[in-house]
Amino acid sequence: MEMKKKINMELKNRAPEEVTELVLDNCLCVNGEIEGLNDTFKELEFLSMANVELSSLARLPSLNKLRKLELSDNIISGGLEVLAEKCPNLTYLNLSGNKIKDLSTVEALQNLKNLKSLDLFNCEITNLEDYRESIFELLQQITYLDGFDQEDNEAPDSEEEEEDEDGDEDEEDEEEDEAGPPEGYEDEDEDEDEAGSEVGEGEEEVGLSYLMKEEIQDEEDDDDYVDEGEEEEEEEEEGPRGEKRKRDAEDDGEEDDD
């Protein structure tokens, strides 16, 4: 199957700009060049073109979001400078099983500043003396060559890398939870409780002052009542006394007439 037909089959009624991963392994490149792949695949992050008889990268479109590129088991012998121009954000590049023979060909990868992992397994260049030391010295940005770092530690799988990233995020969340709220942060519930207590104290003060005023008013009313009662008693006492004086005066007058 030709590459152009393979691409149409892999789209599965999707628009090219919706595709983030595209696997075109084992199809056929006419004249050893890329066909059917263009700039509309702008969201592409993973592209695999293994064993497609690819010999030239000249027709590779601009794929600024591409992170991983699989080009193993082809007949590429040079022209790697195109990768830095068209895929500047590559972190993983697999050129295993190609026709790469010398360090000058690989030197073009120096401009891939984000490149961390490079595979050249089964390329003639691996037969050079001090091959690994030379590649690490030439491409100082990479961490892994043919699956191992400079201390021969094996590179983690892609799935493990994703799990590690998720784990790091979880640890960060836990650390934030343990650290508590940031400085200057105040809990709304605490603010409400404080406001409620202040209101409650204010209400108690108002209630006490109101009760005190009522007691004072009651005492004043009682005093007024006592004064009024004493005046009434005095009037009652003066009333009979006055009448008695009047009668006594009348009796004295009658005696004088006699």
UniProtKB/Swiss-Prot annotation:
Residues 149-258 are annotated as: Disordered. PROSITE patterns: LRR. Residues 123-161 form the LRRCT domain. Disulfide bonds: none annotated. Phosphorylated. The phosphorylation is nuclear localization signal (NLS)-dependent. There is a cross-link at residue 68 (Glycyl lysine isopeptide (Lys-Gly) (interchain with G-Cter in SUMO2)). One of its GO terms (cellular component) is glutamatergic synapse. It holds the Pfam family LRR_9. Keywords: Acetylation, Chaperone, Chromatin regulator, Cytoplasm, Isopeptide bond, Leucine-rich repeat, Nucleus, Phosphoprotein, Repeat, Ubl conjugation. One of its GO terms (molecular function) is histone chaperone activity. Residues 239-249 have a biased composition (Basic and acidic residues). GO terms for biological process: chromatin organization; regulation of apoptotic process. The H2A.Z-interacting domain (ZID) mediates a direct interaction with H2A.Z/H2AZ1. This is Acidic leucine-rich nuclear phosphoprotein 32 family member E.
